[in-house]
């Protein structure tokens, strides 16, 4: 259905509505996904300055890209970073250096750029069955779900309060403030922490409020290339971009698939130099942005979100310092709750399909976290899943 163009009479209310949608989407992007970066980084031994530079890169550069693309196409094309990819990197950092990871980011960006420019994205995804990709994603994500469960032992009251709030908001389904359930859980968690002891951030000079991004010299190694490049590219194309594209198409937009892939690769080359992981089109954030009934104005909320992202990225040291000071159980709960639906979708996609055995093998091999030939398990999950599916499920293939 065609919408009437914005008029003076309704422009203020439309702009306000799009602004609020953008703010809600930003709260989501700046909470649990950032907590996942912090959790992965701390578990891998990265420094606070490394984490701050990572957050700067994925918010600031992608914020500018989101504004440019949304204005150009008059669609809500918001780009951030691949969350499954961040978890893959956390696993990889157990065996390779961060500089080698940076090298893999650059190669992934080049691969995505090539796939977008040649239009091979659809062919690649047709060759690699989605259930196998989802099996690999489930194997990577499941540890975050388990960490949330284990957090009950570490801090039962905090984790219970956050989890019950999350479930209660979902059950009521009609809260006066149209915020995602995760934001209510975040607010409850922050209140409890401040009531107890506050966030003990120590000395934090004003000069550290604005980020001083680090630049990295990439190192290229065969092990990092094999372990990360293909899995990262697959998560960008299949686990992230595909989700965002479906969200946009469902409300009548026509996102440029090959152009999106090309710009994901192009921007990944820049974010990598500052420690940022590969760029992707977002799914959940774009889903929030398109929740209004004015498709012709959705791009406005994407522009607002891009501005929020840039400002947030510039204050990355403050964000990093506060989140690192938070109790581990808080971060584990935030990340676990945020990934519940994604984990459910990954399991459903892996096993409720025509390639369940391939999905199962991909899941088990990835979950096992056993590196072979000095290459991490997510890569082997895809390899063995594809082989088993080809041998046992050829009749199910299209």
Locations of regions flagged by a protein language model:
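Intrinsically disordered, low-complexity non-transmembrane regions of multi-pass membrane transporters
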Residues: 1-21, 197-216, 390-398
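Membrane-embedded helical hairpins/re-entrant loop segments and their flanking transmembrane helices
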Residues: 2-15, 39-65, 230-299
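Hydrophobic, membrane-embedded alpha-helices of multi-pass small-molecule transporters
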Residues: 20-32, 180-181, 195-196, 213-243
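Transmembrane alpha-helix interface/packing and boundary motifs in multi-pass membrane proteins
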Residues: 25-27, 65-77, 173, 267-277, ...
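Transmembrane helix boundary and interhelical junction motifs in multipass membrane proteins
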Residues: 32-36, 78-86, 241-242, 276-286, ...
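Membrane helical hairpin/interfacial module
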Residues: 51, 57-58, 65-121
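Interfacial segments of multi-pass membrane proteins
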Residues: 88-94, 166-170, 285-301, 305-307, ...
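Membrane-embedded alpha-helical modules
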Residues: 95-200, 305-398
């Amino acid at each position: 259905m065609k919408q009437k163009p914005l008029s003076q009479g309704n422009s203020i209310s439309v702009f306000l509505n799009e602004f609020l949608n953008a703010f809600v989407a930003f709260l989501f992007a700046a909470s649990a996904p950032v907590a996942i970066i912090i959790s992965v980084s701390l578990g891998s031994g990265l420094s606070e300055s490394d984490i701050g530079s990572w957050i700067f890169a994925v918010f600031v550069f992608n914020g500018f890209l989101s504004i440019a693309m949304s204005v150009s196409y008059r669609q809500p094309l918001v780009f951030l970073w691949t969350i499954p990819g961040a978890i893959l990197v956390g696993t990889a950092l157990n065996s390779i250096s961060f500089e080698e990871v940076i090298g893999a980011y650059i190669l992934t960006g080049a691969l995505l750029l090539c796939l977008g420019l040649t239009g091979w994205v659809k062919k690649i995804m047709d060759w690699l069955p989605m259930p196998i990709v989802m099996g690999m994603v489930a194997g990577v994500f499941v540890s975050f779900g388990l960490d949330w469960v284990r957090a009950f032992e570490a801090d039962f009251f905090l984790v219970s309060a956050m989890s019950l709030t999350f479930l209660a908001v979902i059950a009521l389904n009609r809260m006066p403030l149209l915020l995602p359930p995760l934001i209510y859980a975040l607010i409850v968690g922050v209140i409890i922490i401040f009531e107890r002891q506050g966030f003990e951030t120590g000395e934090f000079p004003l000069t550290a409020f604005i980020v001083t991004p680090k630049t990295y010299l990439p190192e290229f190694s065969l092990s990092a290339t094999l372990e990360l490049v293909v899995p990262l590219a697959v998560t960008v194309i299949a686990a992230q971009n595909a989700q965002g594209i479906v969200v946009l198409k469902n409300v009548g937009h026509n996102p440029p698939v090959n152009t999106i892939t090309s710009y994901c690769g192009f921007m990944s080359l820049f974010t990598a130099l500052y420690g940022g992981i590969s760029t992707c089109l977002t799914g959940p954030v774009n889903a929030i942005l398109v929740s209004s009934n004015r498709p012709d104005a959705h791009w406005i909320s994407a522009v607002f979100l891009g501005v929020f992202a840039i400002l947030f990225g510039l204050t990355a040291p403050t964000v990093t310092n506060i989140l690192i000071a938070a109790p581990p159980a808080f971060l584990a709960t935030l990340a676990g709750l945020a990934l519940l639906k994604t984990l459910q979708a990954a399991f459903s996609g892996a096993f409720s399909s025509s390639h369940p055995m391939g999905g199962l093998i991909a899941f088990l091999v990835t979950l096992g976290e056993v590196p072979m030939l000095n290459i991490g398990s997510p890569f082997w999950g895809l390899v063995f899943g594809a082989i088993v599916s080809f041998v046992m499920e050829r009749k199910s293939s299209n």
